């Protein structure tokens, strides 16, 4: 789905979604529910598996290795930052001086698994974690992040720091095994290097081979030329938009 900013691309997809309630998987930024405690590890539901390994190795309760439970730094309550509300200004975030941003209490950091504490493990990048955990069952989930070009993310990285394109790819990673579904993505290549765009296109092709249909709002010519069908709206934005300028294959557009 192509067109200048404000031409009606998102509105078209919202209308389409409303016509098929419950049948469309939206991977647009505004549809991804996150908060300050959301991380790639929690979003992909692998944090519990990591905590279980630490708990088993140290013979203590699994809750000790959660910054949302007993393992939380008492000063920042596991947020890693202190948020100061300013009466007439935006809130100010500062790194917690007690845990130095690790989110965990000092007591919890004494426990180790394979020579590293929970904070050190959760600070690993996705690629590092794949090597560290090797044959663990959840490594397959980590590999999905590599497949969408996010191997550089840290397991404990707050998802509030990610770009819109990165957020979409994290959610996309959790849906790679879906079959026969309809997906809507909004500029998923935003901020990506050309090599990463090519990797993402291979992933899209794999998803369509699995019987999925992808509607992609996109400006990238690399994505458009590989599409099966292009719909372009315009000619301008706002009141000047909303008209169908083209509908057909990339070859027909040329």
Per-segment meaning from a language model:
Residues 1-254:
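Conserved phosphate-binding elements of NTP-dependent enzyme cores
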């Amino acid at each position: 789905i192509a067109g200048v900013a404000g031409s009606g691309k998102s509105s078209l997809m919202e209308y389409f979604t409303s016509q098929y309630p419950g049948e469309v998987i939206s991977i647009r930024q505004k549809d991804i529910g996150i908060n300050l405690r959301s991380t790639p590890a929690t979003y992909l539901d692998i944090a519990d598996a990591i905590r279980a390994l630490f708990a088993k190795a140290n013979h203590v309760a699994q809750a000790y290795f959660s910054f949302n439970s007993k393992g939380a730094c008492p000063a920042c309550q596991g947020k890693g930052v202190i948020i100061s509300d300013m009466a007439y200004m935006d809130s100010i975030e500062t790194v917690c001086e007690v845990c130095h941003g690790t989110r965990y209490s000092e007591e919890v950091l004494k426990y180790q698994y394979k020579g590293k504490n929970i904070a050190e493990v959760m600070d690993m990048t996705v690629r590092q974690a794949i090597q560290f955990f090797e044959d663990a069952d959840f490594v397959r989930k980590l590999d999905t992040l590599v497949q969408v070009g996010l191997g550089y993310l840290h397991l404990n990285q707050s998802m509030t720091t990610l770009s819109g394109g990165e957020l979409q790819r994290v959610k996309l990673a959790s849906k790679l095994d879906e079959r026969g579904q309809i997906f809507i993505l909004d500029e998923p290549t935003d901020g990506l290097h050309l090599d990463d765009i090519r990797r993402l296109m291979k992933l899209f092709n794999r998803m369509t081979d699995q019987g999925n249909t992808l509607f992609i709002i996109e400006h990238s010519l690399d994505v458009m030329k590989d599409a099966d069908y292009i719909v372009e709206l315009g000619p301008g934005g706002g009141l000047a938009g909303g008209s169908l300028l083209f509908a057909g294959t990339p070859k027909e557009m040329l």
